[in-house]
């Protein structure tokens, strides 16, 4: 078992793209931890619409007001990444009951792979509970206005890449 720091949390995701819901979760979690590492996953199986480095850059811009938050891209197993940064907590968001089954399965697998790390679930603020990266991408792809769901830099990146 690795030595972990429960004051360091990893918030993993594809962040394709980062949304106001993700930003809200990090903003509310930031005071709870000494450090939050936002881990932007390569996730080739998901076929991200934005390249990894661009997703990292957009997340850094969106979260730059938090001194204790860093954004790092990774292309390894999440368990390896968590151990690499020495985190003792995995942060996950639960928007609705529909998220629960998948998140419960992932938390159980992570508990098996990294038993020294706890998974902490946070729910979004009500105004962000319906936002998902896939919906934001789809609305943007079809020419809809996503400015209420993501930062301006993300909106511009989606317009350019979709």
UniProtKB/Swiss-Prot annotation:
EC number: 2.7.7.3
Domain of life: Bacteria
Subcellular location: Cytoplasm
Protein residues bound to substrate: 14, 46, 78, 92
A single BP term in Gene Ontology: coenzyme A biosynthetic process
A GO term from the CC aspect: cytoplasm
Record's function text: Reversibly transfers an adenylyl group from ATP to 4'-phosphopantetheine, yielding dephospho-CoA (dPCoA) and pyrophosphate.
Similarity field: Belongs to the bacterial CoaD family.
Name used for this protein in its record: Phosphopantetheine adenylyltransferase
